[in-house]
């Protein structure tokens, strides 16, 4: 099934078609790199892209559940045509899972590139709260993807082991003998189980179990294809798991984080000192401005009212003309009372 999956994926790549989610993330990264967004808007765009990745993770989990259910259903089928139809369904699920995994890988790499661009912005350098938040979120997504990888790995092991048991039971049904481990591994790895059973039928004349041969062949084809696709899917997951471990080690580097934290604390203290200096200067110049404004207001009031004009001997201005003083008549001469008598 892996061949079918890888073939369909290669076809989609050759056609030049790209997943819409990946395109959206690349477009948002272009906006960030173009500097069209500030810090808050960058985080908004970042978390929108994270939501896209979460949706793909949910889709991957759904496909894994479908594959597990189909494998359980295959245990109840004993008809070649039914097994063939189920094989097609499982092929489609594994193909979709591989496409989703590759899209997830591309989206996570796009988020890493966006984080690199964000580190070049002011206040968002390596070790900053914004950088650590973004890096932790991306690594969390990778760990979720690693969990999905483990689920698919368990499904692959289950399918392989159950197929081995099925081939052993079929050989026992036809030949009357259960093959040893080496023979069973050789039959499964080389695909000679059908030839082996056909020889047994020819020797024993059991033409009535041709349906069993067809069923085994369909199961063999299905398991081989699925195993190939799951191996390819597993390799994609392993590539991302290496990045998770590497970046997780960087996050867990306590000594380095403490040094970066000390550097940020010192930088913050220096900025507080500068802010205090600017605050004092601002207050001083504010007082000067208020004093100057008061002086200007006083001068305006003085020159508007002109209090010196209300005082008689005041300063400047044209001199007033003196009012002429009327001379009073002299008193009448005194009369000698004696003469009158």
From Swiss-Prot:
Q: Which residues lie on this side of the membrane: Cytoplasmic?
A: 1-284
Q: Which residue spans traverse the membrane?
A: 285-305
Q: Which GO terms describe its cellular component?
A: cytosol; plasma membrane; plasmodesma
At which residues is N-acetylmethionine found? 1
The record's SUPFAM superfamilies line, in alphabetical order, gives: t-snare proteins (SSF47661)
User: SMART domains, from UniProt?
Assistant: SynN, t_SNARE
Membrane topology, record value? Single-pass type IV membrane protein
Q: Which residues lie on this side of the membrane: Vesicular?
A: 306-341
The record's keywords, sorted A to Z, are: Acetylation, Coiled coil, Membrane, Protein transport, Transmembrane, Transmembrane helix, Transport
Ranges where the record places region Disordered: 1-22, 111-137, 312-341
BP GO terms, sorted: defense response to fungus; intracellular protein transport; protein targeting to membrane; vesicle-mediated transport
Any one GO molecular-function label of the UniProt entry: SNAP receptor activity
What spans are recorded as compositionally biased (Polar residues)? 8-21, 126-137
CDD domains recorded for this chain?
SNARE_syntaxin1-like, SynN
Can you give the residue ranges of the t-SNARE coiled-coil homology domain?
213-275
Gene3D superfamilies in the record, alphabetically? 1.20.5.110, 1.20.58.70
Q: Which InterPro entries match?
A: SNARE, Syntaxin, Syntaxin/epimorphin_CS, Syntaxin_N, T_SNARE_dom
- S-S bridge residues: none
Provide the function of this protein: Vesicle trafficking protein that functions in the secretory pathway.
Mind telling me which PANTHER family this protein's record contains? SYNTAXIN (PTHR19957), SYNTAXIN-122 (PTHR19957:SF269)
UniProt lists the family membership as follows:
Belongs to the syntaxin family.
The protein, known as: Syntaxin-122
- What are the top taxonomic ranks of the organism? Eukaryota, Viridiplantae, Streptophyta, Embryophyta, Tracheophyta
């Amino acid at each position: 099934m892996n061949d079918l999956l890888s073939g369909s994926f290669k076809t989609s790549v050759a056609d030049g078609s790209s997943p819409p989610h990946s395109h959206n993330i690349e477009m948002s990264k272009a906006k960030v790199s173009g500097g069209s967004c500030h810090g808050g808007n960058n985080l908004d765009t970042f978390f929108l892209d994270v939501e896209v990745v979460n949706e793909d993770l949910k889709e991957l989990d759904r496909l894994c559940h479908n594959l597990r259910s189909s494998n359980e259903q295959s245990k109840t089928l004993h008809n070649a045509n039914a097994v063939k139809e189920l094989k097609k369904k499982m092929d489609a699920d594994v193909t979709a899972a591989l496409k989703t995994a590759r899209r997830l890988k591309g989206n996570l790499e796009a988020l890493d590139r966006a984080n690199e661009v964000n580190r070049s912005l002011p206040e968002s350098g390596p070790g900053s709260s914004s950088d650590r938040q973004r890096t932790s979120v991306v690594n969390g997504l990778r760990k979720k993807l690693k969990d999905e990888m483990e689920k698919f790995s368990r499904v692959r092991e289950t399918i392989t082991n159950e197929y081995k048991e099925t081939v052993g039971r079929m050989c026992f049904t036809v030949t009357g003998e259960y093959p040893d481990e080496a023979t069973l591994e050789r039959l499964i790895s080389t695909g000679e189980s059908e030839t082996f059973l056909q020889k047994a039928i020819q020797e024993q004349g059991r033409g009535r179990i041709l349906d069993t041969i067809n069923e085994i062949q369909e199961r063999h084809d299905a398991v081989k294809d699925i195993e190939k696709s799951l191996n390819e899917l597993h390799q994609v997951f392993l590539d991302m798991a290496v990045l998770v471990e590497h970046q997780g080690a960087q996050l867990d580097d306590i000594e380095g984080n403490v040094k970066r934290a000390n550097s940020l604390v010192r930088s913050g203290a220096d900025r507080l000192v500068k802010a205090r200096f600017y605050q004092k200067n601002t207050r001083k110049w504010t007082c000067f401005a208020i004093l100057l404004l008061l002086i200007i207001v006083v001068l305006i009031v003085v020159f508007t009212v002109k209090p010196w004009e209300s005082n008689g001997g005041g300063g400047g201005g044209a001199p007033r003309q003196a009012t002429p003083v009327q001379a009073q008549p002299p008193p009448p001469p005194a009369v000698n009372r004696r003469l009158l008598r």
